[in-house]
Amino acid sequence: MPQNYNDTIHKMATPFEMRAGLPKKEPKMLEDWEKNHVYEKMIEHNADLPRFVLHDGPPYANGNIHMGTALNKIIKDIIIREKNMSGYCAPYVPGYDTHGLPIELKALSSLGDKKAGISKLELRKICKEFATEHIDVMNSQFARLGVQGDFANPYLTLRPEFEARQVEIFGEMAKKGYIYKGMKAVYWCPEDRTALAEAEIEYAEDECDSIYVRFKLTDDPNGVLAKYGIPLDKAWIVIWTTTTWTLPANVATCLNPSLEYAFVKIGDEYHLMAAGLVESTMKACHIEDYEVLEPRVLGSEFELMQYQHPFLDRKGLVILGDHVTLEGGTGCVHTAPGHGVEDFEVCVNHYPQVPVIVPVDDGGYLTEEAGKEFAGLKVWAANKVILEHIKQSGHLMGVQHITHQYPHCWRCHHPIIFRATEQWFCSIDKFREEAYKAIDEVKWQPAWGHDRMHGMVRDRSDWCISRQRVWGVPIPVFYCKNCGKYHITDASIKAVSDLFRKEGSDAWYKYDANEIMPKTEVCECGASDWEKDPDIMDVWFDSGSTWSAVCRERPELNWPADLYMEGADQFRGWFQSSLLTSVATQGVAPYKGVLCHGWVVDEQGKQMHKSAGNGVEPSEIIRDYGADIVRLWVASSDYTVDVRAGKNIFKQLSEAYRKMRNTARFMLGNIGDFNPATDMVDEDQLFEIDRWALKSCNSLTANVRAAYDNYDFSRAYHAIYNFCVIDMSNFYMDVIKDRLYCADEHARRCAQTALYRILVDFTKLVAPILCFTAQEIWSYIPKLEGMQEYVCWERMPEAKSDEDAAFDAKWAKIIAVRDDVKKALEQARADKTIGSSLEAAVTLYCSDEMYDFLNAIPMDELADLMIVSHVDLVKGEGGVRGLTEGLGMSVAHAAGNKCLRCWKFDTAVGEDGLCPRCAKVLG
């Protein structure tokens, strides 16, 4: 009866399970980390190291996190974890944006019919409760993703000390002359009844009427019409617009002074338009019978002509502006300064005689000033009514129904309007050049971020910082009741900031203006009776103040921050508002580096929408796979562009994770009896393939560390994955199995030494990405003295300078030969010549150079490399050619009998069923 040698084999054994079970394990690990203050002790341990500050851009505290939030927070966490393991003290202070319209609207919605009589203080109380409630929810959701940080003490924009510092920044900017109050055409949300900043605008497709309207010319003070033989009573000027509702606000028509204009004769009437747009205008108006008159006339000649408004009892003025182009329309631009930025600027700056008319109230309804027949209509409803009116009156020349990109409020997602109102502004022109210099000093990743930010600052208008709402930091300005002038001084700002620091911004609504304003403050007119500004600050001013209210105030942080990292939409949001407030008050950018990521889209690259049913939630993925798979998704993605997410993608990633986990499991399973303090073999005593494996791990370390330094996590992931699958599973671990299970003590300890050293470094390298799995692996690794209990407390491995071109070339050649032999073995298996590869004897037909190369390797080692029982070398051609030059192969069934212990075939297997090697080991 054959003997059983199973008990003589060193079998793989480890409590580290093949099935990860992350959804159940991770919460227990989180409990352990919290109980043992792992994050706090890490920061304390690193306290004397150089500081690295990634300043958290505050997410809005109004709901559950989504895949975009998860992407953002995990990128930050990978950076923070890696820095803390790489010789830095990198504290992470999360923050929350807690003021603003979404919270106020939800608070109002919760009140139902009671909202009509509620006071501002009562409403603010409900808003605060809503925000703080969601902070707790979001804190727990971020922690579930494995994000480390000071979640017990996040920064909140509603905290008194934050609000006080924000008021002081406002005061500093006002003192420098950067803050002013003025009337301008600003983005206005009729649904929310408030002004908006550029950063609060999103664009979406909208359908509208594109109309061509003619205005009857009435006055020709320069005699231009007579000069060219055009009768005034038959002369018209033609405009084009897609906002029919703004026609009641028309007070001027703008021409480019340098463009050529022509009169187009239609019947017995003459219509003025840009010569270069005649054909497209006639086509759009479906007019075929027309005549373009000569000569062409420069737009400058028509300045100050007048025309009759199509339905109101007033005249409009022909004015000039360089913003008029030939890109579309008629070259004669309908100008309503009450509802257009360029319209407002050209009129106010160059034609002060032109009135600014705003016949629309804050809810988007036309007023009596628009005409009695239109009063009370919402602007969108007014479009059709006005269109029908000008059609009946003979002023409409043509209409097309088009789809175009139109600005919408990013909160309520309704279309917005431009509306000239009195607002508070930050004058960008006064420090724009300083901002350019600050932008140049920042490291932008990707590099295109520099030009994007530069272009946005270059092209932007003054920043509208006031909002007509309740839930926010009040505009800290007082008005003299006697003369109406506003009053901002060092003393008034200090009084407000001191009050807010003590009681919070609710105090603005609690006390009368005269109770807040210092008694020493007197208006220029001599009066000292005050009232408060009713508006609040733009929430972008809130978050744009975090560099001061957080980074400069919290002792564990630094300013300027080393890094700001957010989505690409923050170039017009937080990146920009922070830059503007910092440059305005300090003259420098608030950050040394800026890193940005793209949007999360579905598997087809489309935006995720609940209505489309193509979204995935972080909670779903965590429930099904675990948070480490979400983290792996982040690390495996090129986050600088849009990142795809979907169930198929996570399924594929779970397979990739399984391969990496099993690589670690193999290593753990084969070092269970290894004591690194006593069993470690010196490197120069290791087998050459063990040294190759360590060298491969060293290359991995160099590549991954470089990738981390550049925040290129997908490069790190692919290096780790390829190392696990190609270098380890497919080659090294495959080759050393026999040595681990069946060889003598020294040979086995050599392999274990390599595995141990590789596993320690590998676990550290993956720890920033797979924080849960890395800690699980780490808990099973036998520890040397000085090794930490938690892997995140460890230092990253350092890549050694171990360049050895000859060694690398040799092993590259060995692997190439092995790959060819593996293919030959697969064919032999398909031909039923062999079953397992250990049944094979391989003959290698070699060129002289290849023979000398392979013959230098002991044949038993060569057979182990190929995982066959026997290898013969023959000079000359023969067998099947592979990809390796100078090599042919043939495979036959190995001679001899199968060793009952190691399963190799050998002609010297004894009666006990053992090959000589196994017999010696059991000796």
What are these regions (language model features)?
Residues 97, 186, 190, 196-204, ...:
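Acidic, turn-prone loop/beta-hairpin segments
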Residues 252, 259-332, 341-345:
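Protease-associated
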Residues 219, 316, 350-363, 469-471, ...:
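Alpha-helical recognition segments enriched in aromatics with Gly/Pro capping
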Residues 189, 409, 480, 520-524, ...:
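Short cysteine-rich clusters marking metal-coordination/redox-active sites
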Residues 2-10, 15-22, 28, 32-36, ...:
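Residue patterns forming the tRNA-binding/recognition surfaces of aminoacyl-tRNA synthetases
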Residues 46, 50-57, 68-71, 75, ...:
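Secondary-structure capping and boundary motifs in well-ordered enzyme cores
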Residues 44-106, 239-247, 254, 319-346, ...:
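N-terminal catalytic cores of NTP/NDP-binding nucleotidyl/phosphoryl-transfer enzymes
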Residues 193, 468, 484, 524-527, ...:
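Cys/His-coordinated zinc-binding microdomains
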